[in-house]
Amino acid sequence: NKFMSEDSVITEVGSTKRNLIKFTKNKNLILSHPIAGSEVSGPNFGSKDLFNNKWCILINKGKKSKINTVKKFWKNLGSKVILMNAKEHDKIFAITSHLPHLIAYNLIKTAQDYQKVEKKNIIKFSAGGLRDFSRTAASNEIMWRDIFFSNKDNMINSINKFIKNLNLIKKKIKANKDKE
């Protein structure tokens, strides 16, 4: 590539990886996912210790020397670094990150719909539980929609597992049993 020297290293910080693997033919590209941040983004919300003691996932694809350079970069920012493959990454984060955001958006929408129908401000009565979900749901909807779509198969599997467990709980509540 005439625009980049052989010594160059490129990394990215997206939430899904399988769709990006095709770009790792460029051996200078190393896929990263720092597990840090909050519902707000941008330079005004940064902090010097944002990555301290937080995990950063590196996708184990590319030149070992480039992976080591990116690994050192994240460690210098205070991160704990682990390597994994893209398929495993996307499967794990569908459950641990993407599904919780989807649930938060859905729960807040359910509360808003209830308010509209009942014409009562129920949100003001929410304690920590709903407030925590509303904080998560305050994240950028467009960004999360794109994350859901880019991890579609894992999201559908995660949603199906969640619905299955939710239906089991619903069945127990209907039967008024706490254990089977």
Feature-to-residue mapping (PLM):
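Interdomain hinge/lid region at the active-site interface
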Residues: 119-180
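Short, flexible, solvent-exposed loop/turn segments with mixed acidic/basic and small polar residues
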Residues: 44-50, 143-146
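Rossmann-like NAD(P)(H) cofactor-binding subdomain of soluble oxidoreductases
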Residues: 1-44
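Residues that form or flank phosphate/diphosphate-binding pockets in enzymes
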Residues: 19, 65, 157
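Glycine-rich beta-alpha junction loops
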Residues: 15-17, 35-36, 62, 88, ...
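Internal alpha-helical scaffold of NAD(P)-dependent oxidoreductase catalytic cores
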Residues: 48-135
